Design a protein with these regions (language model features):
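Conserved beta-loop-beta element that borders a ligand/cofactor-binding pocket
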Residues: 173, 195-218
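Non-catalytic terminal and boundary segments that flank Rossmann-like NAD(P)-dependent oxidoreductase
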Residues: 2, 6-65, 281-290
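NAD(P)-dependent short-chain dehydrogenase/reductase
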Residues: 215-238
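Core catalytic loop region at the nicotinamide-binding pocket of NAD(P)H-dependent oxidoreductases
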Residues: 243, 247-249, 253-285
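SDR active-site strand-loop-helix element
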Residues: 69, 93, 132-133, 169-175, ...
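NAD(P)H-binding glycine-rich loop region in Rossmannoid oxidoreductase-like domains
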Residues: 98-156, 160-163, 178
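N-terminal Rossmann NAD(P)H-binding glycine-rich loop of SDR-like oxidoreductase domains
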Residues: 58-86
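Substrate-positioning beta->alpha
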Residues: 149, 153-154, 189, 219-221, ...
Length: 290
């Protein structure tokens, strides 16, 4: 990759991330304003680092047609440029009238993620469906929102994909079971959506992270020493690994690996598998092209 290409990509990423955090309708203090822009720069640096990492990996021999719901959020906005870089065709669902800024190379279609009737007809010819819709900044106080947004959008996506016979459905869930009852509503909704996937007999990859470290989401780094101790102790090791922290880069690579290795039946990708995606992706591509 040339220096000019890196600079161009960095500039586009900065523009995209500044666009994400600028919201005139929400009053902020100067401190909030500065913090948002610091997060935007950090996100752009993270985007460039991930893009350079992906460029060093071998590409899949088969290009996928990918339909994404929730593509303008924290995970989706990092995933889409990587899928495009790996020569996949990406179609993103956005709300009618949305001013969300997306890479020019992806196709944008209008619809409501809470009503599959508004977008079912534009899913094809996609062969892979990634569902990333979720209430931003989950907290115990948002139980009603989880059922109104996460549950309804998941049900609609699963139903539409089952009716269309989608080749591969990828669902971003959450690690469970978990001993923390404070997020029980969030976990319950994701578990119910997983059950729907099973009942509709979709060929699906279910990805179960716990907390995703990245720009604006770094405070849990303080918990790393605690996690290390729990992973070392035999009676807490399994839970610590299941509910471990993953980085945004690890999660994006796990999603890419899922896209490029469709499954028959159901595959669950937990925290240990998410962490190892950077190693497994080149092996999977080598296996496919052998």
């Amino acid at each position: 990759m040339s220096f000019r290409t890196v600079c161009t990509t960095l500039g586009a990423s900065l523009e995209l991330n500044f666009f994400r955090v600028c919201n005139p309708a929400r009053p902020t203090t100067i401190q909030d304003w500065l913090q948002e822009r610091i997060n935007a720069v950090a996100a752009s640096i993270s985007d460039i680092r991930l893009l350079l990492r992906v460029k060093s990996l071998p590409k899949s021999s088969e290009s996928r047609r990918v339909f994404i719901t929730g593509g303008t959020g924290y995970i989706g906005s990092a995933l889409i440029p990587i899928l495009l870089e790996r020569d996949h065709r990406v179609r993103v669902l956005v709300r009618p009238g949305s001013k969300a800024k997306l890479p020019a190379a992806c196709e944008v279609v209008s619809g409501d993620a809470l009503d599959a009737n508004t977008y079912r007809q534009v899913i094809r010819p996609s062969d892979t469906f990634i569902h990333l819709v979720g209430v931003p900044h989950p907290s115990p106080a948002k139980g009603a929102q989880f059922r109104a947004v996460d549950m309804v959008s998941g049900r609609e996506a699963i139903s539409a994909c089952a009716e269309l016979g989608m080749r591969h459905f990828i669902y971003l869930s959450v690690a469970h079971p978990a001993p923390l009852r404070i997020m029980k509503d969030y976990i319950a909704v994701r578990a119910e959506c997983e059950q729907m996937i099973q009942e509709r007999h979709l060929n699906a990859t279910i990805i179960r992270p716990w907390y995703v470290l990245g720009p604006g989401h770094r405070w849990p780094y303080l918990l790393l020493p605690f996690y290390k101790v729990c992973e070392w102790l035999p009676f807490t090791r399994a839970g610590a690994l299941r509910l471990g922290l993953v980085t945004l880069e690890q999660l994006i690579l796990a999603l890419v690996q899922a896209v490029e290795s469709p499954i028959q039946g159901t595959r669950v990708v937990g925290v240990p598998e998410i962490r190892s995606a950077a190693l497994n992706l080149p092996r999977e591509i080598t296996r496919q092209t052998a």
